[in-house]
């Protein structure tokens, strides 16, 4: 087989298959609140695979939690913006994935906190509409109901 063919087709497929194994460790680090460790691993993967929605989703989640635990407002805002940037990219790749949609709503809600009242009202309609869709797709996910204040 041609070496170039292997490099462009076989090797990326191999690494795509191994992602599921890598995600279990990353997900464990996320659940253990090791956000900085997780971020380093995810950024390395994202450099290799910039259009992988699973990597983008986890990058968004990581930045969301870094934003939530930030002490300084500047750090909070920067991480919230990064969280939205990553999930917006994942959303553009697959807007029907329930977890992508859930975290899109969360990140959007966080970023509108800094907007004008008018913009917040406009975005709240979009957030409500998307939240209802997320609840429909993930009816057992308590986080979804929390988004809607239920």
Question: Model-predicted segments: where are they?
Answer:
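Short coil/turn linking the two alpha-helices of tandem helical-hairpin repeats
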Residues: 65-74, 110-119
């Amino acid at each position: 087989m041609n070496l170039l063919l292997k490099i462009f087709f076989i090797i990326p497929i191999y690494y795509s298959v191994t992602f599921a194994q890598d995600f279990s460790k990353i997900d464990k680090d996320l659940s253990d609140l090791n956000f900085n460790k997780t971020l380093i691993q995810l950024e390395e993967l994202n450099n290799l695979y910039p259009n992988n929605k699973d990597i983008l989703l986890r990058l968004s989640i990581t930045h969301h939690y870094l934003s939530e635990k930030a002490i300084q407002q500047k750090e909070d805002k920067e991480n919230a913006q990064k969280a939205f940037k990553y999930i917006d990219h994942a959303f553009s790749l697959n807007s029907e994935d329930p977890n992508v949609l859930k975290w899109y709503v969360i990140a959007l809600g966080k970023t509108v906190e800094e907007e004008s009242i008018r913009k917040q009202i406009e975005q709240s309609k979009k957030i409500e509409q998307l939240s209802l869709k997320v609840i429909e797709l993930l009816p057992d996910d308590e986080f979804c109901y929390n988004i809607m204040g239920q």
